[in-house]
Amino acid sequence: MPDSAPSQPNPQPSDHKATMENSPLTEFVVQFWGVRGSIATPGTKTIRYGGNTSCVEMRLGKKRLIFDGGTGLRVLGLNLLRQMPVEAHMFFSHTHWDHIQGFPFFTPAFIPGNCFHIYGAIAPNGTTIKQRLADQMLHPNFPVPIQVMQSDLKFNDLTPGDILELDDVKIETALLNHPNTAIGYRVTWGGHTAVYCTDTEHFPDRVDDNVVHLARNADVLIYDANYTNEEYYNFKTPKVGWGHSTWQAGVEIAKAAGVKKIVMFHHDPSHDDNFLDGVEAEVQAAFANGCLAREGMSIPVI
C-alpha cells in the first residue's frame, strides 16, 4: 500500500524540493526523481546516480508535468504531500513495468481534492492507458483496485503525432522505436523547450528522423542511453532489438538536432556509480554540454 505521509523528508542527492509555492512563474525546471531503467537498483553502489526507475517532473509557470511513473513517482509523491491540493499532468511514454510500477504507490492519487490528468497512447492490442494502469492493480498483483484512488483521475488517450495545448504550454508527441511502441514528448513554454525521449532504439545506418524532429533546437534533451556501443554491439550478448539506445547515438542525435544540452537517462541496472562516472566523462568529451541524470538533480531550462 502507498505511504500515508512521509515521517521525514525523503533524502535526495539534491536539496531541491518538488514545490511550486515559492517558485517564480517564469521558472522552467526539469527535476529527476527516477533515472534507472528496467528494474530498481537500491544499494551502496548506486547512491550517487540513484536506483529508482523512470520519473521526471517539469515545472513551468503554473503547470506541473510528470513523465512516467516508475518507482521514482513514489518519492515525488511524498514530496507533493507538503503542498495540497495538487494538480498535475502525467504523461506516460509507454507501459512497460519500469514506467508504471510506481503508480499504485503514488500517495497523492489516493487523496480527495487532488487532480491528475493522465495521458498515454493506446496499445497495439487496443487497450487504453486507463485500462493498463488499472490492470496492474488487480488481484493477484495488488491488494486494492484503482477505484480506491480518491483523487480526480482524468484519462486521455493519445496517438503519436498529437499536439496538445495546455494554456500556454505546447506539447508535441512522436512515435519512438521501441517494442510495443513508445511516445516521446516535446514541451515548449516561453520560447524554450525540453524533450523527454526515452525507451527508443537508434537505427544502425541513419539517425531517427522522428527523434531529430522532436529534439530540434531543444534547450534540454533527455535521452535513453541505457547502453554503451560496446554493450549494444557485443558479439556474445548483443542488445540490438531490445528497444534502447546508447550515449554515442544520443550525442549524434543532439548534434544533428542542434540541441543545447543533453541528459543521458534510463541507466542500465548493471551500471554502478563508478561505471556511470566513466560514461559521463566520455559523454562530456564528445559533447561539452552533456551529463548523466541523477536522482534529485534539477536543470533549469530557462
Please tell me what each predicted stretch does:
Residues 2-195, 203-206, 211-212, 277-302:
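Binuclear metal-dependent hydrolase catalytic cores
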Residues 37-40, 199, 227-232:
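Short regulatory "switch" loops immediately downstream of catalytic or recognition motifs
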Residues 67, 93, 198, 223-225, ...:
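Active-site flanking residues adjacent to catalytic metal/cofactor-binding acidic residues
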Residues 121, 199, 267-268:
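Short strand-loop junctions, especially beta-strand C-caps/beta-turns
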Residues 203-295:
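Cap/insert and terminal regions of metallo-dependent hydrolase folds
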